[in-house]
C-alpha cells in the first residue's frame, strides 16, 4: 500500500515538473556523463558488468525522454580513453554490450520513426573490428536523419580530440590546403570528432550522475565555449529517473533566466550612467560592471 501511494505521488510530481519545464526553453544539446555503474553493482554484490548492463537499460529510457521533451542532440559518454586501463575482461564486456546496443538501434523501428541520426565520436582506431563494423552500419543507416541526433563517445578524451584536430589543421596548413588566415573557431570545430562531418554543436547542459562534481575531460571545446549549465546528481546511472532529467532541465532554465536578469541589470546601469553624463569623473565606474555582484544577480 505504501509503495503504491508513493508511486502515485511520484508520477504526479513528475507530471507537474514536466509541465513546468515544457513552458520554458528546452536545451537543444544535452551531454551526459553516465557514472556509477560499477558502484551500483558493488552495492548489490554483483559483477561490474551487471552494473553496466543495468545502466544500458537506463540509457535507452533517457534517449526516449530526451526525444519526448524536445531535445535535439544527446551526447553520451560511453567509454573514455582512461577506461582502457580497466581489466581486459571488463573492457571486453563493455565493448560487447555497446555492440549489442548498436545492433539493436539498427533494427529498432523507433530509430527510423524518430529520424534519429547516430554517430560515434572518439578514436575508433582503438576499437575492435566487430564494434567498428556495427558503428559503420548504424551510421550509414541513419546518416540522412536530422530530427534527433545521438552522439556516442567511445575511446574519447577531450584533450586528445583537440590535439588531433590541431594536428590535422597543421598538416593542411603545411601542405598548402589551408592558410593560417583560414584558422578560426568554426574550422577547429569541423576538425573535432567525428571529423569529417557535421561538427558536434556547443553543449547547453551537462549532466553527471554518481555524486562526483567534475566534467572528466568531456567535450571541453563544446562545453566551455557555450558556458553550458551543469547538473550533478547523487543517483548512480542505473538509478537515474525521468525526474532527475527534468530537474536538470529546470537548472538549465533557471541559469538562463539568471543570465537574462544579469544582462538587463548591466544594461540599465550603463543607461543610467550615460543619462547622468559625468563621463570623465565616473569612467572608472564602467569597469565595475564586469565583476558586478548584486543580490539575485551572479
From Swiss-Prot:
PROSITE patterns: UPP_SYNTHASE. Its EC number is 2.5.1.89. Disulfide bonds: none annotated. It catalyses: geranylgeranyl diphosphate + 7 isopentenyl diphosphate = tri-trans,hepta-cis-undecaprenyl diphosphate + 7 diphosphate. Binds 2 magnesium ions per subunit. Pfam families: Prenyltransf (PF01255). The active site is at 35, 83 (proton acceptor). CDD domains: Cis_IPPS. Mg(2+) binds at residue 35. GO terms for biological process: polyprenol biosynthetic process. GO terms for molecular function: ditrans,polycis-polyprenyl diphosphate synthase [(2E,6E)-farnesyl diphosphate specific] activity; magnesium ion binding. Its cofactor is Mg(2+). Substrate binds at residues 36-39, 48, 52, 80-82, 84, 86, 208, 214-216. The keyword Metal-binding applies. Keywords: Magnesium, Metal-binding, Transferase. It is an enzyme of class 2 (transferase). Belongs to the UPP synthase family. Homodimer. Catalyzes the sequential condensation of isopentenyl diphosphate (IPP) with geranylgeranyl diphosphate (GGPP) to yield (2Z,6Z,10Z,14Z,18Z,22Z,26Z,30E,34E,38E)-undecaprenyl diphosphate (tritrans,heptacis-UPP). It is probably the precursor of glycosyl carrier lipids. This is Tritrans,polycis-undecaprenyl-diphosphate synthase (geranylgeranyl-diphosphate specific). The gene is uppS.
